[in-house]
Amino acid sequence: MNDIVKSAWASVKMNTDFICVDTYSGYRSNQLDPLGVQHLSSPDVSDLDLGEMVKDALSHSRFVLPAPRTDIWIHPEVTFDLDLYDSRRTVERYDEWVKKLMVHYGYKTKRALFKDMKSCDICCNHDAITISPTRHEKLEVWGGTGLKGSDNVILSVDSSPTEIGAGLRLALSRCKG
C-alpha cells in the first residue's frame, strides 16, 4: 500500500512572552527534530516575519524513518535517522527544549512557562498547509478534545509569508484551554 504522502511539519507554541516555531520531522507521525530550526519571537511579531519563521521551519523538516525496511512499501524520498526515533533521546530533547525556554525567558517553574500556552501543529503536503489548533488539557499536554476539523486553517502552499503568518494567528485564536 503506497498511500504515504511526503509531508513537512512544524510545531508552534505561544504564551504571553513568546512565539516558538520548531521543526518537526517524521514519516506518518512526527516529533521535534534536533537537526531542524527553532525560531523565537515576541507575540507581536509581524505576520510577514511569523510566516517566514513557519516557512523556514517547514523547509528544514525531514521525511524520515528510523531504518530501512523490506516488509512494507517505503516512499522513495524517505531518509533514515535512528537517533530521531530513540525514545530516550526524545525525552532528553524535550527536557532540553523546556530548559532552554525557561532559561531564555527567566521562568522559575514549568507552570510559569506553560501557563496559558497555546499550541498549533502545522503539516504541509500536496498543495496545502494545514494549521491545527489544540486544547491545552494539562500543564504539558495538548490535544484535540472539543475541536472540529473546521477549526483548522488550510492555506495553499503558494500562500505568501504574510498570509501564512495571519493564518497561524487565526489558528492560535482557535486554541482552547
Swiss-Prot record:
Q: What is the top-level taxon of the source organism?
A: Bacteria
Q: Which InterPro entries match?
A: CdiI_Proteobact, Cdil-like_sf
SUPFAM superfamilies, alphabetically?
NMB0488-like
Other notes: Encoded in a defective cdi locus that has been inactivated by gene rearragements and deletions.
* Quaternary context: Interacts with the C-terminal DNase fragment (residues 954-1077) of cognate toxin CdiA-YPIII.
Q: What does this protein do?
A: Immunity protein component of a toxin-immunity protein module, which functions as a cellular contact-dependent growth inhibition (CDI) system. CDI modules allow bacteria to communicate with and inhibit the growth of closely related neighboring bacteria in a contact-dependent fashion. Neutralizes the toxic activity of cognate toxin CdiA-YPIII (residues 954-1077). Does not inhibit toxic activity of CdiA from other toxin-immunity modules.
Recorded protein name is Immunity protein CdiI-YPIII
